[in-house]
Swiss-Prot record:
One of its GO terms (cellular component) is plasma membrane. Residues 5-241, 252-491 form the ABC transporter domain. This is Ribose import ATP-binding protein RbsA. InterPro entries: AAA+_ATPase, ABC_carbohydrate_import_ATPase, ABC_transporter-like_ATP-bd, ABC_transporter-like_CS, P-loop_NTPase. Part of the ABC transporter complex RbsABC involved in ribose import. Responsible for energy coupling to the transport system. Signal peptide: none annotated. It is found in: Cell inner membrane. SUPFAM superfamilies: P-loop containing nucleoside triphosphate hydrolases. The complex is composed of an ATP-binding protein (RbsA), two transmembrane proteins (RbsC) and a solute-binding protein (RbsB).
Amino acid sequence: METLLKISGVDKSFPGVKALNNACLSVYAGRVMALMGENGAGKSTLMKVLTGIYSKDAGTIEYLNRSVNFNGPKASQEAGISIIHQELNLVGNLTIAENIFLGREFKTSWGAINWQKMHQEADKLLARLGVTHSSKQLCAELSIGEQQMVEIAKALSFESKVIIMDEPTDALTDTETEALFNVIRELKAENRGIVYISHRLKEIFQICDDVTVLRDGQFIGERIVAEITEDDLIEMMVGRRLDEQYPHLSQEKGECVLDVKNVSGSGIDDVSFKLHAGEIVGVSGLMGAGRTELGKLLYGALPKTAGKVRLKNQEIENLSPQDGLDNGIVYISEDRKGDGLVLGMSVKENMSLTSLDHFSQKGSIRHQAEKMTVDDFILMFNIKTPNRDQQVGLLSGGNQQKVAIARGLMTRPNVLILDEPTRGVDVGAKKEIYQLINEFKKEGLSILMISSDMPEVLGMSDRVLVMREGKISAEFSRKDATQEKLLAAAIGK
């Protein structure tokens, strides 16, 4: 078995945090190596050390049997190591082809950009991934899932020997995911090595040959996937067995808090449902069914064109997100970096951004009260950060999600709308978020949980609404809901 890449004994420290402590990873030709660990385990840091974004404090990196120390992503990419990042990194006002070949445009013999060649090559890459869009389309016009496929096409364009995929399927549909898996199988057949970073256990057992686990920055072990179970893998990741993945809380629901009647708007058509105090209603459906649009419309981020929304028996009109907040409705976006967090600001500033009025007295901010409240939320949510002043963009994906949810809760809402609450979150942090959601439910909060993860919807919800083409196509009680029923309602069978 040929080893393409071998990382051994790597250490990396930041002020107040030892991010990596004897981290190891091997990548083999023609095999897929899963890299797993809870958020904050050091996966992203290790990849940044490999590609030269961070310098290592100790350890060795061998690539194609030579010791290497890359001075940046460009150097590692030119050497044949490509990384597909978890968060999108495209220029919205450029076309798909321009994004794929940015800085590497094809030129004619007289030095002009060869647009025909560039679009032909981009279209070939898109076809390989099963994407039907023209490469001349602007990236800003694509969905998050479609933009992710462009990122993958961009990485494939380098024909690298080692390809690192960081949560590549998080925003993909089942069809897009299967297309990606087919590409991975092709890459394996070409003797390339793949590093597959994911929190989705099902995918690890579907597509990966080997798995390496990090915990708290340390190398825990490398295993052959065919020789372990999900429970074995979870125990390696979190140091304990997780007998119950979805800790559903059974309790009597309270009064009707949100009453939505015949609402239409951007991507929404004649939607009606009720949401009670202390109840979790899941919203399921395929990508493009209108789930996110429903959440944003109720919050005030998208316009309502028809219908009525009543909150605690009072009709409300949320013409803007500020109206939504004022009326006690909070929306936590699926795109935490696009719609949610301000990455250059601190944990404290992000968390208290929408609730500064709670800390105001006679026109000035009570900073001590703000700091104490933020510290309480950091403790309650188990947010892994050196301190409240840490830049939120430096936190792991799961900890960023916790900050986003904490910010929403700090406004003391009546209704919490969670859009893909565990997107990009590992299995251990997922359970922490589920337990937090249960605490909110116990306190009487009304929760609308939008998710493409059917087991999550089935595991946590008291009722499930299924959306298709902007309408609610079905509603199921917890005891009647099954994955088969949800899928049938989502596709119109």
